[in-house]
């Protein structure tokens, strides 16, 4: 038996500008936080190697600009994603309201094989701030209505729930990657109607 190959997982972080996507990524990968805000231009990514159930996994985490002019980054950017992280700011209701459009944008551009079960994770960021505007129950209700998406309330600044959230992200992404590999290795069998079983094929293979 050949040794198990190294797994590369592509994770995309989406959300409005200023919700803390870059800060969350930097806190998880580099254990750093900066109070200086610098808008992401286009897209950028960081990598991190983690062990999951004795498997070495390399996470390629893509951070995107939230401005509308960058919203359509192209099919190549979205394709091949194993998990999509949707981020909003709990102190800014408008960033929560746009989660639907970000989710739809991803599904349209990425065209996953099984969109109904594609793994999303939602992060309500900046819980360290006092002027909270989006209630936990409201966010949980939205996630439940979207096939029960896992939801975490985070603070990139205080490193609250960041590690826990990304553990769920990598496990869900790994599950998606495994299912895709199995799908590619074992294509769906041809289903014959019971009336077709006794009929010889006159057309031959339709491949």
Swiss-Prot record:
Gene name linked to the record: RAB7A
Taxonomic lineage: Eukaryota, Metazoa, Chordata, Craniata, Vertebrata
GO cellular component, as recorded: autophagosome membrane; cytosol; late endosome; late endosome membrane; lipid droplet; lysosomal membrane; lysosome; melanosome membrane
A GO term, aspect molecular function: GTP binding
GO BP terms in the entry: early endosome to late endosome transport; endosome to lysosome transport; endosome to plasma membrane protein transport; lipid catabolic process; lipophagy; phagosome acidification; phagosome-lysosome fusion
Descriptive protein name: Ras-related protein Rab-7a
Membrane topology: Peripheral membrane protein
Enzyme Commission code(s) on record: 3.6.5.2
This protein's record includes keyword Cell cycle: no
Listed CDD domains: Rab7
Species annotation: Bos taurus (Bovine)
Modifications the protein undergoes after translation, according to the UniProt entry: Deubiquitination at Lys-191 and Lys-194 by USP32.
Record SMART domains: RAB, RAN, RAS, RHO
Domain remark text: Switch I, switch II and the interswitch regions are characteristic of Rab GTPases and mediate the interactions with Rab downstream effectors. The switch regions undergo conformational changes upon nucleotide binding which drive interaction with specific sets of effector proteins, with most effectors only binding to GTP-bound Rab.
């Amino acid at each position: 038996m050949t040794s198990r190959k190294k797994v590369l997982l592509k994770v995309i972080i989406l959300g409005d500008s200023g919700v803390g996507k870059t800060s969350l990524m930097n806190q998880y990968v580099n254990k750093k936080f900066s109070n200086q805000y610098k808008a992401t231009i286009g897209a950028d990514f960081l990598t991190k190697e983690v062990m999951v159930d004795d498997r070495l996994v390399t996470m390629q985490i893509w951070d995107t600009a939230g401005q509308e002019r960058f919203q359509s980054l192209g099919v190549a950017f979205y394709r091949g994603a194993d998990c999509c992280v949707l981020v909003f700011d709990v102190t800014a209701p408008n960033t929560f309201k746009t989660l639907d459009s970000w989710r739809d944008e991803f599904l349209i551009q990425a065209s996953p094989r099984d969109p109904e079960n594609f793994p999303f994770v939602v992060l309500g960021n900046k819980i360290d701030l006092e002027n909270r505007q989006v209630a936990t129950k409201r966010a949980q209700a939205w996630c439940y209505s979207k096939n029960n998406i896992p939801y975490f309330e985070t603070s990139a600044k205080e490193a609250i729930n960041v590690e826990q959230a990304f553990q769920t992200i990598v496990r869900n992404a790994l599950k998606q990657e495994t299912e895709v590999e199995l799908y590619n290795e074992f294509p769906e069998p041809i289903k014959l109607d019971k009336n077709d079983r006794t009929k010889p094929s006159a057309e031959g293979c339709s491949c």
